A protein has these predicted regions:
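Glycine- and acidic
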Residues: 1-4, 21-34, 104-108, 226-228
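Long amphipathic alpha-helix in the N-terminal Rossmann-like dinucleotide-binding domain
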Residues: 2-17, 27-57, 66-71
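An alpha-helix initiation/capping motif
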Residues: 2-5, 36-44, 143, 261, ...
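Rossmann-like NAD(P) dinucleotide-binding subdomain of oxidoreductase/dehydrogenase enzymes
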Residues: 13, 24, 53-207
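Short linear capping/connector segments at secondary-structure termini
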Residues: 22-29, 61-66, 258-264
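ALDH superfamily catalytic-core signature
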Residues: 124-129, 151-153, 157, 164-309
């Protein structure tokens, strides 16, 4: 526990600017999004995990004057495989760290789009005192690494955050290999969502617009909590439409190195092409109207204009 509390202190102090900068440059987060993720949330994860671990150990069966009862927790018989996403540096650190904190050896496969901040996380853990061989980072082809890991007899658990279909594939492969493992693997996963905003007729129009625009376009909508659809009363729509256009057009787009930019590039070309195809489809669909935005350009970066359809 002391090691990870020290890691939290290192991130809060000497590594704060470095891990924020890595998250901004390599994951294209603006300064605000980087600070609340790579610094604040990661520090909270590490400190809260220690607190929760303490509570777990403190929760013991009752003893009597002539009988002492104690419940001990031990690590799994094997290693935990941590698979982490690009969109939150905090989650990328938390998944391997929480398993290691409970005494497990971890193989950590970061996203290929999060390598820079992953390296800094490992530097922090080493300086804090995590021994060599406890958290083992593996870079490479995700499918190849995962298939190799899941084929090992010593595989004892997976800690995953990512897309639903990938998690289903992993679960299926674990099931196919279940006869091969030493023990029954523990499976923990957090997957994507399709979040929405619902507005009541009594709601304040400006507040609804803020909820939609900020909810949809923070970090270019690249998180499971992003608002990707909205349901609003017809009576509210004329005023809300104008407010949405005003608010969306006020967002500056460009490099995260300019602290005035709210919108930055999407994570990679595959994401850019997917979003551009949706915009193109909307332009061709007679039943769809692009309220604001609708432009994209990858000549100097993977920039998608914030778009409401």
């Amino acid at each position: 526990a002391a090691i990870f509390l020290k890691a939290a202190e290192l991130i809060a102090g000497p590594y704060r600017a470095k891990i924020n900068a890595a998250t901004m440059i390599a994951q294209s987060k603006n300064i605000h999004q980087a600070e609340i993720d790579a610094a604040c949330e990661l520090i909270d994860f590490l400190r809260f995990n220690v607190e929760f671990m303490t509570q777990i150990y403190a929760d013991q069966p009752k003893s009597t004057s002539d009988m002492w009862n104690r419940l001990e927790y031990r690590p799994l018989e094997g290693f935990v495989y941590a698979i982490t996403p690009f969109n939150f540096t905090a989650i990328a650190a938390n998944l391997p760290a929480s398993a290691a904190m409970m005494g497990n050896v971890v193989i950590w496969k970061p996203s290929d789009s999060q390598v820079f901040s992953a390296k800094i996380i490992i530097d922090v853990f080493k300086e804090a005192g995590v021994p060599d061989g406890v958290i083992n980072v593996v870079f490479g082809d995700a499918l190849m690494v995962t298939d190799t890991v899941l084929a090992s007899r010593d595989f004892a658990g997976v800690h995953f955050t990512g897309s639903t279909h990938v998690f289903k594939d992993i679960w299926a492969k674990i099931g196919m290999n279940i006869h091969h493992y030493k023990t029954y693997p523990r499976i923990v996963g957090e997957t994507g969502g399709k979040d929405f905003v619902v507005a009541h007729p009594s709601a304040n129009v400006k507040q609804v617009a803020t909820g939609i625009v900020r909810g949809a376009f923070e970090f270019q909508g690249q998180k499971c909590s992003a608002a990707s659809r909205a349901y609003v009363p017809q009576s509210m729509w004329p005023a809300l439409k104008e407010q949405l256009i005003t608010d969306t057009k006020s967002m500056k787009m460009g490099s995260p190195e300019d602290f005035g930019n709210f919108i930055t590039a999407v994570i990679h070309e595959g994401s850019f092409d997917k979003l551009a195809s949706y915009i193109d489809q909307a332009k061709k669909d007679a039943d769809a109207e692009i309220i604001v935005g609708g432009n994209y350009d990858k000549s100097v970066g993977y920039f998608i204009e914030p778009t409401i359809i």
